Curated annotation (Swiss-Prot):
A Pfam family that the UniProt record links to this protein: SHMT
Record's function text: Catalyzes the reversible interconversion of serine and glycine with tetrahydrofolate (THF) serving as the one-carbon carrier. This reaction serves as the major source of one-carbon groups required for the biosynthesis of purines, thymidylate, methionine, and other important biomolecules. Also exhibits THF-independent aldolase activity toward beta-hydroxyamino acids, producing glycine and aldehydes, via a retro-aldol mechanism.
Keyword Ribosomal protein: no
UniProt-listed Enzyme Commission number(s): 2.1.2.1
Gene that specifies this protein: glyA
The name this protein goes by in its record: Serine hydroxymethyltransferase
Binding site for (6S)-5,6,7,8-tetrahydrofolate: L120, G124, H125, L126, S352, P353, F354
GO CC, alphabetical: cytosol
PROSITE patterns reported in the protein's UniProt record: SHMT
UniProt cross-references to InterPro entries, sorted A to Z: PyrdxlP-dep_Trfase, PyrdxlP-dep_Trfase_major, PyrdxlP-dep_Trfase_small, Ser_HO-MeTrfase, Ser_HO-MeTrfase-like, Ser_HO-MeTrfase_PLP_BS, SHMT-like_dom
GO annotation, biological process: glycine biosynthetic process from serine; tetrahydrofolate interconversion
Assigned protein family: Belongs to the SHMT family.
Biological pathway: One-carbon metabolism; tetrahydrofolate interconversion; Amino-acid biosynthesis; glycine biosynthesis; glycine from L-serine: step 1/1
Description of how the protein assembles with itself and partners: Homodimer.
Amino acid sequence: MSEWKHLHQVDPEVAAAMDREKKRQKNNIELIASENFVSEAVMEAAGSVLTNKYAEGYPGKRYYGGCEFVDQVERLAIERAKRLFGAEHANVQPHSGANANMGVYFACLEPGDTVLGMNLAHGGHLTHGSPVNISGKYFRFVAYGVDAHTGRIDYDEVARIARETKPKLIVAGASAYPRVLDFARFRAIADEVGAMLMVDMAHIAGLVAAGLHPSPVPYAEFVTTTTHKTLRGPRGGMILCKQEWAAKVDKAIFPGLQGGPLMHIIAAKAVAFQEAMAPAFTAYQKQIAANAAALAKGLTDRGFQLVSGGTDNHLMLVDLRNKQLTGKEAEKRLDECRITVNKNAIPFDPQSPFVTSGIRIGTPAATSRGMDEAAMDQVAEAIHLCLSDGSEGAMQKAVAIVDALCARFPLYA
């Protein structure tokens, strides 16, 4: 029987789709690096009566009446975010990481200003200046990337480009970079050319909160993040900044980019921040990193090539060219074995972004199920059976491994 009792009565089609999605999440191994499974407490907050409340403005300065209780919720989220990351100011209203990034741009830049960000094709993000994104249309972005041989950011090259282009803002952070980011070096480069520094830590925020990745907060005027991914909160965004930028950042989000905040999601963010301050969260993040290292080793031992040779965080990029597979083909084949990944461009990829030569793999969601290093080696074996062999017998063996792991590590048990 479905848990969506009222929904089944009102809209059985949507309820049925939700039932199928829940079944997929329970019976598949989720390896998309940007996805995770929130706690039931976070889901309760996200599905609460707060979805009914309009609250344009900020706590104590609303354009609607009846905001005394949602003010309490937003203040909790703000104070917890500041405490969790040691920040001077936090804006928890962005609906997404993309909105958080645009909020920073509109707070500190004018249209046409020069910004230095990471090349999307080398692991950056659409909102770091891709020409198809609004960021690339409003501002003059120039790109840095990774070294062709090491797969790592060449900071000397970043400095050279910064000296040549004199950006007003440098953006550090990535959506597909498996190595530690040197925020001190980015700060030094920014200072040398008179630029501000923004760090998009969307992927690594949970690791930063747990002290397992250097924090960008002491180095950057602005830090943006999503609240899902490794942070294991609801889908949403957040901006941390120095106090001197607080008013401009807040004004850029509301009324600049958004109207009413999503108070039910802000409540869920507050819950996630509270969870992230517990000792169990640090242990969880340590397991994410240990699982990523174990999965990287398991794949390497089975003949897979990883961009940069491995990982320092929660994700890895697999270069499939030695397997004579495209990322698109690998994603489809793994999905048939109930392993969920996403096709992803590798640096200097000869394939189009719709095909790609690689896949991106991450461990946050599998770790949320309780999987450990031994389980990651079994996952590596299932991936190997599916992609290196691909015969019907091998695919059946891979599915059997997935079934056993999902039974051993149930979701929302």
